Design a protein with these regions (language model features):
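Membrane helical hairpin/interfacial module
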Residues: 59-125
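Membrane-water interface signatures at transmembrane helix termini and the short loops
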Residues: 231-267
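Membrane-interfacial helical/loop segments at transmembrane boundaries in membrane proteins
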Residues: 183-208, 282
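Alpha-helical transmembrane segments of multi-pass integral membrane proteins
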Residues: 134, 140, 159-182, 211-226, ...
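Haloarchaeal acidic low-complexity proteome signature biased toward cell-envelope/secretome components but also
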Residues: 1-39, 148-152, 156-157, 233-234, ...
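Membrane-interface helix-loop-helix junctions at boundaries between adjacent transmembrane segments
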Residues: 112-176, 187, 194
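Short, hydrophobic transmembrane alpha-helix segments
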Residues: 49-63
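Alpha-helical transmembrane segments and their membrane-interface exit regions
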Residues: 73-78, 130-142, 262-272
Length: 296
């Protein structure tokens, strides 16, 4: 709500996006315990791999996959374990059997259908996975930008640009800078379910051509520039720069593993905690550990 010059009260259609109900006290604690550590970890990895390249150090593949596997167990399962409670929380209601059953039904139908698509059209399923993850990660970072960094992206175009930039950097930047590794993962995943001997692997070959990768690079640049333009925020520009350098310099699997552990999952969990009135009060009072244990 905003006051007009004539004393009337005008409706502010973007007010709900400015803080997402995160109080200043809760925000300060989450910045300290969630945002700042993510900057430190990703920044440290950028510096570390600059040194790795400078001294020509080789990292065994198993060590590159380890953070990714750990992230799935330690953060992946917990960060999605309360998804069935989210719709009710978003409506400021207590979860009940009906709301939980509805979410579980929708999830089950989606999983069954999607699993079938993997066997019939694995290349399409892989592309859909990339697109869905891009949206999910971008939407999560959009919330963090608005609620924690207070970037003030009010327009729909600005929010769309932020979502695309934030989601595309982890999903598409490795394709631009590490095409061989990206292709290796894509072909390995697609071939697992390509039981009918379809041309699943060859169907994605175009994505690794220089022309397509150049188009992706241009898309990333435009999305990032548009995000900074709409936000006018140094925090937004700084985080985009950090993410861009990070995914351009750290090997993809290792980069995704640490990003998921220390960036996406922690911000997603922080978002869910902020939606819980009891957890939010504990965070604001400085009891961040109590809020987290309420989550787990």
């Amino acid at each position: 709500m905003e006051g007009s010059d004539n004393g009337d009260v005008e409706y502010d259609e973007y007010a709900e996006y400015r803080d997402y109900g995160v109080s200043d006290g809760c925000r300060r604690v989450l910045l300290q315990w969630v945002v700042l550590p993510s900057w430190f970890v990703l920044g440290a990895l950028v510096v570390s791999f600059a040194l790795v390249r400078a001294y020509d150090v080789s990292i065994p593949p198993e060590y590159r996959y380890l953070p990714f596997l750990v992230s799935i167990v330690v953060f992946g399962l917990p960060h999605g374990a309360v998804d069935h409670l989210v719709p009710a929380r978003l409506r400021d209601e207590s979860p009940d059997l009906r709301s939980v059953s509805y979410v579980m039904f929708v999830y089950t139908v989606f999983v069954v259908v999607y699993a079938g698509v993997w066997f019939v059209a694995p290349a399409f399923a892989f592309a859909f996975f990339i697109a869905l993850t891009l949206y999910h990660w971008g939407q999560g970072d959009l919330h963090a930008s608005l609620a924690l960094l207070r970037t003030g992206v009010d327009s729909r175009a600005g929010r769309a640009a932020t979502l695309l930039a934030r989601g595309s950097l982890p999903m598409l930047a490795p394709l631009v800078f590490f095409p061989s590794e990206y292709r290796e993962v894509a072909e390995a995943v697609i071939s697992v379910t390509d039981v009918f001997g379809s041309s699943g692997v060859s169907a994605v070959a175009f994505a690794f051509e220089p022309t397509f990768r150049l188009a992706v690079a241009v898309f990333l640049a435009v999305a990032c520039v548009a995000t900074v333009y709409f936000s006018r925020s140094s925090f937004e520009a700084g985080e985009l720069l950090l993410l861009g350098v990070y995914f351009a310099s750290v090997p993809p699997i290792l980069a995704i593993g640490f990003y998921f552990c220390f960036w996406h999952s922690t911000r997603h969990i922080a978002r869910l905690l902020a939606l819980d009135p009891v957890a939010s009060e504990r965070i604001e009072s400085g009891d961040a550990s109590g809020a987290f244990f309420r989550f787990v």
